[in-house]
């Protein structure tokens, strides 16, 4: 009996961290490192560099700060949602001060979670990657 093995490599998932604070970049990188599925990490400090990264690479998950030097993360998620190629990428909006206005934009753009940076952890990453439908989740 002859057997065949599939030697094709499964592409490794890649997380794009869009955050201008080096300290918060490190925190998010540590959280990704503790998740069950190991991922490559790419970091963008601005929305402009995030756009370039999204054009050049396949991204599996986006961790997005709301206040960036060249724009607002909550507005950027609307841009992502309008792009058919990018709309299916799970997004977690990680902010110092989530506001009701941010929740509204996040929900309309299909963001998985809006999380305070102090509360952000592995469970959000694993749940976002495990969900098949993009949706915003928040406490009522």
Protein language model annotation of sequence segments:
Residues 64-80:
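Conserved phosphotransfer microenvironments
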Residues 22-42:
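Two-component/phosphorelay signaling modules centered on CheY-like receiver
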Residues 19:
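Conserved acidic carboxylate
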Residues 129-140:
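The C-terminal output helix
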Residues 101, 118-129:
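C-terminal output helix
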Residues 73, 105-113:
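As written
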Residues 43-61, 124:
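Acidic, metal-coordinating helix/loop segments flanking the phosphotransfer/catalytic sites
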């Amino acid at each position: 009996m002859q057997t065949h093995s599939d030697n094709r490599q499964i592409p490794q998932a890649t997380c794009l961290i869009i955050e201008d604070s080096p300290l918060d970049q490190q925190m998010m990188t540590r959280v990704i490192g503790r998740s069950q599925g190991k991922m490559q990490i790419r970091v963008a400090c601005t929305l402009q560099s995030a756009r370039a990264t999204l054009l050049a690479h396949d991204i599996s998950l986006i961790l997005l700060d709301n206040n960036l030097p060249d724009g607002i993360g909550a507005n950027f998620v609307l841009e992502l949602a309008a792009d058919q190629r990018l709309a299916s990428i799970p997004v977690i909006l990680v902010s110092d001060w989530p506001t009701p206005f941010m929740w509204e934009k996040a929900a309309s753009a299909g963001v998985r979670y809006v999380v305070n940076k102090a509360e952000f952890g592995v469970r959000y990453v694993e749940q976002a990657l495990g969900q098949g439908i993009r949706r915003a989740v928040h406490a009522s």
